[in-house]
Regions:
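Transmembrane alpha-helical insertion/packing segments
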Residues: 2-55
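Core subunits and conserved enzymes of cellular information-processing
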Residues: 57, 62-156
Length: 156
């Protein structure tokens, strides 16, 4: 079935609302929980496994959206990818706000204008940055694209 035919399939309103609800739920709760686990790993173990957290977030988002539908539609997969990207943003906000809080010991010292800026968390995708061709950045991009593909494919 071609891409045009997949978009022409009818969308059931009940499925659409259920998918949007589940996507937002997983983006917020999954992002907060996985961000807290990422913070715990950075603080206690001293290293970061954000690529592993990407797969966990993509898996949880795709599974939750797949269970929320009766009939499959390509819009649901696109919503899954958008929920994954929102969850990735919330995961990073949670982890970095927690790191600043545990370092300074006060909520008033957290620079919310920097913490809530999404450009900071998605800067690794910017091809004109000076760090774009570093090995760690290339690995981050590869795992991010694989996680997006996973969220798209397995939410069908």
């Amino acid at each position: 079935m071609g891409l045009k035919e997949q978009f022409r399939k009818p969308i059931h309103k009940q499925d659409l609302f259920s998918v949007i609800y589940q996507a937002l739920f997983m983006a917020f709760t999954g992002g907060i929980l996985i961000g807290a686990v990422l913070l715990l790993m950075i603080r206690l173990l001293g290293f970061e496994l954000s690529w592993l957290m990407l797969f966990v977030l993509a898996m949880l988002t795709a599974r939750r959206i797949k269970q929320a539908t009766y009939e499959k539609h390509i819009i649901f997969s696109i919503i899954s990818v958008l929920a994954f990207i929102l969850g990735y943003y919330i995961m990073n906000v949670t982890a970095y706000a927690g790191m600043i809080f545990t370092t300074t010991g006060s909520v008033s010292n957290i620079p919310f204008d920097l913490i809530l800026n999404p450009v900071y968390y998605f800067y690794f995708l910017y091809p004109l940055s000076s760090t774009f061709f570093q090995v760690s950045n290339i690995l981050e991009i590869v795992f991010f694209v694989i996680a997006i593909h996973y969220a798209f494919k397995y939410s069908k």
